[in-house]
Amino acid sequence: MHGKVPTLQEVILELAPQTEIDLQCNEQLDSSEDEDEDEIDHLLERPQQARQAEQHKCYLIHVPCCKCELVVQLDIQSTKEELRVVQQLLMGALTVTCPLCASSK
């Protein structure tokens, strides 16, 4: 470059073909049924794990202590259906006691 701004004449483009690359692979793979089965099992596990992660979510439930009315926090991992069962139990006769009241008996 001889000036402040490059000109098209100063830019030299040389396009030369690269040497040809041999795309043939001379490697041989051992066909192992165990590896194939492991790969299939791994592929089947992933969707199942994803489904379990979707089904079992973490829920925080705040329930008053049955003796002192202090709020107790319950961390529950369950499906929505199981959470409904817990909700029905808490709305019924099931009561929760805070650690202070439980230790004082």
Swiss-Prot record:
Keyword S-adenosyl-L-methionine tagged: no
Pfam families with a match to the protein in the record: E7 (PF00527)
InterPro entries on file: Papilloma_E7 (IPR000148)
Top-level taxon in the UniProt lineage: Viruses
ZnF start-end (unnamed): 65-101
UniProt motif (Nuclear export signal) ranges: 83-91
Locations listed in the record: Host cytoplasm; Host nucleus
Single GO molecular function: zinc ion binding
Motif (LXCXE motif): 23-27
Main location: host cell
Keyword field contains Metal-binding: yes
Stretches the record annotates as E7 terminal domain: 1-45
UniProt keywords, alphabetically: Activator, DNA-binding, Early protein, G1/S host cell cycle checkpoint dysregulation by virus, Host cytoplasm, Host nucleus, Host-virus interaction, Inhibition of host innate immune response by virus, Inhibition of host interferon signaling pathway by virus, Interferon antiviral system evasion, Metal-binding, Modulation of host cell cycle by virus, Oncogene, Transcription, Transcription regulation, Viral immunoevasion, Zinc, Zinc-finger
GO cellular component: host cell cytoplasm; host cell nucleus
Family per record: Belongs to the papillomaviridae E7 protein family.
Role of this protein: Plays a role in viral genome replication by driving entry of quiescent cells into the cell cycle. Stimulation of progression from G1 to S phase allows the virus to efficiently use the cellular DNA replicating machinery to achieve viral genome replication. E7 protein has both transforming and trans-activating activities. Induces the disassembly of the E2F1 transcription factor from RB1, with subsequent transcriptional activation of E2F1-regulated S-phase genes. Interferes with host histone deacetylation mediated by HDAC1 and HDAC2, leading to transcription activation.
UniProt domain comment: The E7 terminal domain is an intrinsically disordered domain, whose flexibility and conformational transitions confer target adaptability to the oncoprotein. It allows adaptation to a variety of protein targets and exposes the PEST degradation sequence that regulates its turnover in the cell.
Self-association state and partner proteins as the record states: Homodimer. Homooligomer. Interacts with host RB1; this interaction induces dissociation of RB1-E2F1 complex thereby disrupting RB1 activity. Interacts with host EP300; this interaction represses EP300 transcriptional activity. Interacts with protein E2; this interaction inhibits E7 oncogenic activity. Interacts with host TMEM173/STING; this interaction impairs the ability of TMEM173/STING to sense cytosolic DNA and promote the production of type I interferon (IFN-alpha and IFN-beta).
Name this protein carries in UniProt: Protein E7
